Amino acid sequence: EYGPSVAMPRILDLLDDYGIKASFFVPGFIAETHIKLIEDLVSRGHEIGHHGYMHEPPATLNKEEEAEVLDRGTAILKKITGNVPAGYRSPSWELSNNSLQLLHDRGFEYDSSLMGNDIPYIVNAGSGSIVEVPVHWELDDHPFFNYSPYLGQTNVAASPRHVFEIWSAAFEGLYNYRRSF
């Protein structure tokens, strides 16, 4: 409950203070569990993107299961926000061989799961194409702070100062080359 109850209000206030709008990729189950938070995100002008239902990695699902997860998450997000999500970020940032086609068929405007560039680019989606807004593991907090003994992930959490230095250097490098962060 720390994330939705303590961290998110702080993050939202910080974004408001600087006039920044952000994209939040939310699993359907989390949206159902924290409806007021999702409504607050939308009322502040932030984008809500699709992030699975129970954070299922698409590569572990067959095509029908993956389609059902996409449809279920989309229905939940539409019910809460009033809008069909435009963007998708895969749980675990891994896609199946069917993912891009399924996203294209459902009208998603973009995916944000791949790392083929450091600016948006077009990817083949079977019978069409979709915009890819790339991500990078270095810019995610998970590798630095994840601690989950149940999953065998017992790394010592990184120093926030060290992570800030990494992210700052990444920002400066991408900024200098006029790339996306």
PLM feature spans:
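Glycine-rich, positively charged active-site loop/lid region within alpha/beta enzyme cores that binds
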Residues: 134-156
